[in-house]
Amino acid sequence: VAEPLPALRTEHGIDVLAEHDGSGESGPRVLIVGVGSMAHTAVGVADALSAQGIGSLAVDPRWVLPVADGLVELAGRADLVVTIEDGIADGGIGSAVRDALACADVDVPVRCHGLRTEFLDHASRGQIVESAHLRAQDIARSVAERVAAQGRSREDHPVAGDLG
């Protein structure tokens, strides 16, 4: 069992565990939702992204279902939502968050990190986390690549407000 993480504050009923401004944009660029013991990983991801100049907000929703309206509101202020769970990702919490955002017309990409639906060889928790690429550095690398790709996409395809 992981050590409890103190919240910096509670916002909309959601525990905020880490907050990094990144490049000074308004609102978090990446919302990182860490569930249960993966809340520690979410903080590690936020710290690693901050070292790369990427703003983030790492949160623990305190409960997962139903998806809290406050989590949907926080997601609406992000460019990317990342969920991290140590359960099966298919049909897991990340999927529930994605569905809740879609129902609320919040158009933000969601990346789900969790275990694949497969038989796991007998191993320690650490070995499983490592083989599933659920360590903070693995997820941070994936998120940084996604953020970079989103930035290139905006440059290649500006939105109407960017056309000047």
For each of these PLM feature ranges, what is it?
Residues V1-G164:
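Thiamine diphosphate
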